[in-house]
Amino acid sequence: MSVTDFSIQIKEGTKKSHSAAENTSFVASFLRGVVNKESYRTLITDLYYVYSAMEEEIDELQDHPIVGHINLSDLNRVESLEKDLRYYYGPIWRSLIDPSESCTQYVNRIREVAKDNPILLVGHHYTRYLGDLSGGQILKGIAKKALKLEGNHGLAFYEFDNIPDAKAYKACYKGILNHLDLDQKQVDAIIEEANYAFKLNMDMFNSLEGNWFQSLLQIFISSIFKKK
């Protein structure tokens, strides 16, 4: 049995959370083109840990009757994030990064559901990957301009080299969701988890807001002293 309108249910069921995530101070500032390199590379670092956990767990569950269907290598982000981290931190980037506390909580949740109730990974997968695919090119343009980047350096995260038509791919992805062998109770649980995934993302963004504000304050104070 499959719930043929699952893709509609999860979209409608996460609308409020989606809107709330977009309205965190950090994301709102990012969308206005107000972002500094330090906060951005911290974001990339946290996303690296999140995607590493998600892709590792989903790969481990490739034979799972539900999770196996969302093991879509075209969407994988870890390799792209590694390129960006190398750009922002240099060749020894692995020794220079650590996850934030909110990121660690996010990663722990991914590991937990993978072990205890793997179908909930569908909610996490939907929350991150479909969002990346939907807004990737817009965010890429904003980041490129705000950070004054040349070419595509530092922007690999937004590149989906194996997906030439994002709109068509999203339609295919929604079709996969609609054909998963789930009952309504399971669908409801996945939607609840997707909303929790949005909260975990918001917690990460809110921690970045502190970094962003601190950097802005430092610039402001520096400019005052220069004027003196």
Q: Language-model segments: which ranges?
A:
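Metal- and O2-centered redox machinery and metal/ROS homeostasis
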Residues: 1-228
